[in-house]
């Protein structure tokens, strides 16, 4: 028998709720724009590429006369696009507080520590301070993930050793699997 882990069960429930969330979002867009045809420019952080394409397929079927233009970049670049008002919709964590914008919570973005299968902490309940002596692989400065991790470390006074910074969650996962260090990913 194959069974999902508790984290897998949580992910499954989250994925199942994405369609409902997207339908509510589509209705909100309808109300805001009365949009039936034209172009919708969407800028999203790189981590949103894991769930947004499925939702966009549903949107395109519902609104075949609306062309989508996507910009996928790290948080820093998306914030700059927001400041320049380049797009119609922005998908990110932690939008800037200094802008007068409408914020619509979309989806919880939980972070987890990723470790090689044989690591001593696998299966254990540990906190980030417990892992302070371990080398970490982080997303690059300017990414939403790095922003969230840095913010958490500043709030808690936690210091982690950064062995390497990368712009790819996939590369980070592969390097973690090879034993190069731990990571905190969404």
Task: Briefly describe each language-model feature range.
Residues 5-8, 42, 82-83, 131, ...:
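Hydrophobic residues within well-ordered alpha-helices
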Residues 35, 39-45, 90, 114, ...:
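Short, well-ordered beta-strand segments
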Residues 3-31, 37:
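Alpha-helical "hinge/linker" immediately C-terminal to small N-terminal DNA-binding modules
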Residues 122, 135-156:
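Secondary-structure junction motif
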Residues 55-64, 86, 129, 146-159:
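Ligand-binding cleft/hinge of the Venus flytrap
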Residues 13, 17, 32, 54-58, ...:
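Short beta-strand-centered segments that line the small-molecule binding cleft or hinge
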Residues 27, 33-63, 67-72, 76-80:
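N-terminal winged-helix
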Residues 67-74, 93-94, 138, 159-168:
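Short beta-strand-to-loop elements that line the ligand-binding cleft
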């Amino acid at each position: 028998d194959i069974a999902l882990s508790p984290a897998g069960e949580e992910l499954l429930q989250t994925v199942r709720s994405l369609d409902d969330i997207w339908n509510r979002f589509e209705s909100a867009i309808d109300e805001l724009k009365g949009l039936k045809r034209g172009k919708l420019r969407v800028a999203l952080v790189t981590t949103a590429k894991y769930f947004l394409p499925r939702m966009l397929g549903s949107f395109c079927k519902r609104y075949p006369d609306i062309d989508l233009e996507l910009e996928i970049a790290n948080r820093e670049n998306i914030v700059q696009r927001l400041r320049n008002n380049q797009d119609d919709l922005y998908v990110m964590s932690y939008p800037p507080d200094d802008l007068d914008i409408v914020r619509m919570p979309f989806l919880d973005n939980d972070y987890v520590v990723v470790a090689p299968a044989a690591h001593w902490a696998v299966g254990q309940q540990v906190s980030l301070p417990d892992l302070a002596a371990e080398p970490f692989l982080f997303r690059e400065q300017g990414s939403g993930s790095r922003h969230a991790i840095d913010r958490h470390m500043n709030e808690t006074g936690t210091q982690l050793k950064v062995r390497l910074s990368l712009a790819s969650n996939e590369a980070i996962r592969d390097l973690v699997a090879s034993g190069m260090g731990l990571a905190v990913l969404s």
